[in-house]
Swiss-Prot record:
EC number(s) on file: 2.3.1.181
Record organism: Rickettsia bellii (strain OSU 85-389)
Involved pathway(s): Protein modification; protein lipoylation via endogenous pathway; protein N(6)-(lipoyl)lysine from octanoyl-[acyl-carrier-protein]: step 1/2
Record gene name: lipB
Keyword Protein biosynthesis attached: no
Protein name as catalogued: Octanoyltransferase
Protein backbone atom coordinates (compact mmCIF):
# COMPACT_ATOMS: atom_id res chain seq x y z
CA UNK A 1 0.00 0.00 0.00
CA UNK A 2 1.28 3.46 -0.89
CA UNK A 3 1.70 5.63 2.20
CA UNK A 4 1.09 9.37 2.17
CA UNK A 5 3.69 11.35 4.14
CA UNK A 6 3.01 15.01 4.91
CA UNK A 7 5.82 17.35 5.93
CA UNK A 8 3.90 19.72 8.26
CA UNK A 9 6.07 22.84 7.92
CA UNK A 10 7.65 24.57 4.88
CA UNK A 11 10.87 22.84 3.91
CA UNK A 12 13.98 24.01 2.07
CA UNK A 13 14.10 22.56 -1.44
CA UNK A 14 17.57 21.09 -1.03
CA UNK A 15 16.55 19.39 2.21
CA UNK A 16 13.51 17.86 0.56
CA UNK A 17 15.63 16.69 -2.36
CA UNK A 18 17.97 14.85 0.00
CA UNK A 19 15.00 13.33 1.80
CA UNK A 20 13.41 12.26 -1.47
CA UNK A 21 16.58 10.73 -2.92
CA UNK A 22 17.25 8.83 0.30
CA UNK A 23 13.74 7.39 0.19
CA UNK A 24 14.10 6.48 -3.50
CA UNK A 25 17.20 4.45 -2.66
CA UNK A 26 15.31 2.63 0.09
CA UNK A 27 12.49 1.75 -2.30
CA UNK A 28 15.00 0.51 -4.89
CA UNK A 29 16.66 -1.66 -2.22
CA UNK A 30 13.32 -3.00 -1.01
CA UNK A 31 13.72 -1.35 2.39
CA UNK A 32 10.69 0.96 2.20
CA UNK A 33 7.19 0.91 0.68
CA UNK A 34 6.07 3.22 -2.08
CA UNK A 35 5.12 6.66 -0.81
CA UNK A 36 3.73 10.04 -1.78
CA UNK A 37 5.37 13.01 -0.06
CA UNK A 38 3.27 16.15 0.38
CA UNK A 39 5.37 19.24 1.03
CA UNK A 40 5.34 23.02 0.89
CA UNK A 41 8.62 24.71 -0.02
CA UNK A 42 10.33 27.88 1.04
CA UNK A 43 10.46 30.26 -1.94
CA UNK A 44 12.70 28.90 -4.69
CA UNK A 45 13.03 28.79 -8.46
CA UNK A 46 14.00 25.38 -9.80
CA UNK A 47 15.29 24.55 -13.26
CA UNK A 48 14.82 21.20 -14.94
CA UNK A 49 17.16 19.54 -17.40
CA UNK A 50 15.70 21.39 -20.41
CA UNK A 51 15.99 24.93 -19.04
CA UNK A 52 17.40 27.92 -20.93
CA UNK A 53 19.16 30.55 -18.86
CA UNK A 54 17.32 33.38 -20.61
CA UNK A 55 14.08 31.99 -19.14
CA UNK A 56 15.23 33.23 -15.74
CA UNK A 57 14.15 36.87 -16.01
CA UNK A 58 14.75 38.24 -12.52
CA UNK A 59 15.15 36.02 -9.48
CA UNK A 60 14.44 38.91 -7.06
CA UNK A 61 16.69 37.40 -4.38
CA UNK A 62 14.78 34.13 -4.55
CA UNK A 63 17.23 31.19 -4.60
CA UNK A 64 17.69 29.34 -7.89
CA UNK A 65 18.42 25.61 -7.87
CA UNK A 66 19.28 23.47 -10.88
CA UNK A 67 17.73 20.02 -10.55
CA UNK A 68 17.73 16.68 -12.33
CA UNK A 69 14.01 16.59 -13.03
CA UNK A 70 12.52 17.03 -16.47
CA UNK A 71 11.16 20.36 -17.61
CA UNK A 72 12.30 23.97 -17.33
CA UNK A 73 11.94 26.75 -14.75
CA UNK A 74 9.18 26.81 -12.18
CA UNK A 75 8.50 28.44 -8.83
CA UNK A 76 7.84 26.76 -5.49
CA UNK A 77 6.71 28.60 -2.40
CA UNK A 78 4.07 29.24 0.23
CA UNK A 79 0.53 28.22 -0.65
CA UNK A 80 1.63 25.61 -3.17
CA UNK A 81 1.18 21.89 -2.61
CA UNK A 82 4.14 19.98 -3.99
CA UNK A 83 3.61 16.26 -4.48
CA UNK A 84 6.45 13.77 -4.77
CA UNK A 85 5.18 10.28 -5.68
CA UNK A 86 7.88 7.67 -5.13
CA UNK A 87 6.48 4.68 -6.97
CA UNK A 88 8.14 1.52 -8.27
CA UNK A 89 7.04 1.12 -11.88
CA UNK A 90 8.76 -2.28 -11.98
CA UNK A 91 6.20 -3.81 -9.61
CA UNK A 92 3.73 -6.30 -11.15
CA UNK A 93 0.79 -3.92 -10.61
CA UNK A 94 2.56 -1.06 -12.42
CA UNK A 95 3.92 -0.50 -15.93
CA UNK A 96 7.43 0.42 -17.05
CA UNK A 97 6.17 3.30 -19.14
CA UNK A 98 7.12 6.84 -18.15
CA UNK A 99 4.70 8.48 -20.60
CA UNK A 100 1.85 6.42 -19.20
CA UNK A 101 2.92 7.39 -15.69
CA UNK A 102 2.77 11.10 -16.56
CA UNK A 103 -0.68 10.63 -18.11
CA UNK A 104 -1.83 8.96 -14.89
CA UNK A 105 -0.48 11.89 -12.86
CA UNK A 106 -2.40 14.27 -15.11
CA UNK A 107 -5.60 12.27 -14.71
CA UNK A 108 -5.14 12.19 -10.93
CA UNK A 109 -4.84 15.96 -10.64
CA UNK A 110 -7.62 16.68 -13.15
CA UNK A 111 -9.99 14.40 -11.21
CA UNK A 112 -8.99 16.00 -7.90
CA UNK A 113 -9.66 19.50 -9.21
CA UNK A 114 -13.01 18.39 -10.63
CA UNK A 115 -14.19 17.75 -7.05
CA UNK A 116 -14.05 21.53 -6.57
CA UNK A 117 -15.83 22.28 -9.82
CA UNK A 118 -12.59 23.19 -11.59
CA UNK A 119 -12.57 21.82 -15.14
CA UNK A 120 -8.90 21.21 -15.82
CA UNK A 121 -7.33 19.71 -18.92
CA UNK A 122 -4.06 19.05 -20.70
CA UNK A 123 -2.75 20.79 -23.82
CA UNK A 124 -0.85 18.83 -26.45
CA UNK A 125 2.92 19.43 -26.28
CA UNK A 126 2.56 21.57 -23.13
CA UNK A 127 3.30 19.65 -19.96
CA UNK A 128 1.14 20.48 -16.97
CA UNK A 129 -2.47 20.98 -16.00
CA UNK A 130 -4.46 23.90 -17.40
CA UNK A 131 -7.76 25.65 -16.77
CA UNK A 132 -9.62 28.45 -18.53
CA UNK A 133 -10.10 31.63 -16.54
CA UNK A 134 -12.97 34.10 -16.92
CA UNK A 135 -11.44 35.57 -20.07
CA UNK A 136 -11.26 32.05 -21.58
CA UNK A 137 -7.46 32.11 -21.71
CA UNK A 138 -5.62 28.90 -20.72
CA UNK A 139 -3.77 29.29 -17.42
CA UNK A 140 -1.53 26.71 -15.79
CA UNK A 141 -2.62 25.58 -12.35
CA UNK A 142 -0.18 22.68 -11.90
CA UNK A 143 3.32 21.94 -13.15
CA UNK A 144 4.71 18.45 -13.68
CA UNK A 145 8.36 17.38 -13.78
CA UNK A 146 9.46 13.84 -13.05
CA UNK A 147 12.50 11.63 -13.01
CA UNK A 148 12.98 7.88 -12.66
CA UNK A 149 15.84 5.82 -11.26
CA UNK A 150 15.76 2.05 -11.77
CA UNK A 151 12.06 2.50 -12.51
CA UNK A 152 11.40 4.25 -9.20
CA UNK A 153 9.81 7.67 -9.75
CA UNK A 154 10.59 10.91 -7.97
CA UNK A 155 10.07 14.67 -8.27
CA UNK A 156 6.47 15.25 -9.31
CA UNK A 157 3.72 17.89 -9.28
CA UNK A 158 3.23 21.42 -7.96
CA UNK A 159 -0.34 22.71 -7.57
CA UNK A 160 -1.09 26.35 -6.84
CA UNK A 161 -3.54 26.59 -3.96
CA UNK A 162 -3.06 30.07 -2.48
CA UNK A 163 0.30 30.81 -4.09
CA UNK A 164 1.49 34.40 -4.60
CA UNK A 165 1.34 34.25 -8.39
CA UNK A 166 3.47 37.39 -8.79
CA UNK A 167 6.47 35.22 -7.90
CA UNK A 168 6.16 33.58 -11.32
CA UNK A 169 7.02 36.92 -12.95
CA UNK A 170 10.71 36.25 -12.38
CA UNK A 171 10.73 33.36 -14.86
CA UNK A 172 9.17 32.13 -18.06
CA UNK A 173 7.25 29.26 -16.43
CA UNK A 174 8.08 25.93 -18.07
CA UNK A 175 9.62 27.86 -20.98
CA UNK A 176 6.22 28.92 -22.32
CA UNK A 177 6.32 32.60 -23.23
CA UNK A 178 3.21 34.65 -22.48
CA UNK A 179 1.69 31.74 -20.56
CA UNK A 180 -0.43 32.55 -17.52
CA UNK A 181 -0.58 30.83 -14.16
CA UNK A 182 -3.49 30.58 -11.79
CA UNK A 183 -4.43 29.07 -8.43
CA UNK A 184 -7.43 27.59 -6.67
CA UNK A 185 -7.84 30.85 -4.76
CA UNK A 186 -7.83 32.90 -7.96
CA UNK A 187 -10.53 30.60 -9.30
CA UNK A 188 -12.65 31.26 -6.22
CA UNK A 189 -11.87 28.04 -4.34
CA UNK A 190 -10.62 28.59 -0.80
CA UNK A 191 -9.53 25.45 0.99
CA UNK A 192 -7.03 24.44 3.65
CA UNK A 193 -4.05 22.46 2.39
CA UNK A 194 -4.96 19.54 4.66
CA UNK A 195 -8.43 19.32 3.14
CA UNK A 196 -6.98 19.35 -0.36
CA UNK A 197 -4.62 16.55 0.67
CA UNK A 198 -7.57 14.35 1.64
CA UNK A 199 -9.01 14.70 -1.85
CA UNK A 200 -5.64 13.91 -3.40
CA UNK A 201 -5.36 10.69 -1.42
CA UNK A 202 -8.89 9.53 -2.29
CA UNK A 203 -8.41 10.23 -6.00
CA UNK A 204 -4.92 8.70 -6.04
CA UNK A 205 -6.26 5.30 -5.05
CA UNK A 206 -8.66 5.35 -8.00
CA UNK A 207 -5.84 5.84 -10.52
CA UNK A 208 -2.86 4.05 -8.97
CA UNK A 209 -4.51 0.85 -7.77
Amino acid sequence: MVQFITIPTPIDYQDSLMLMEDYVNKVIDGEAPEAVYLVEHLDVYTAGTNYKQEELLNHNNIPVIYTGRGGKFTFHGAGQRVIYPILNLALPNRTKDLKLYVRMLEEWIINSLDIFGIKAYIIKNKVGIWVKTNDDIPSKIAAIGVRVRKWVTYHGIAINISTDLSKFNGIIPCGLENSLVTSLNQLGVYIEMTEFDKILEVEFIKIFK
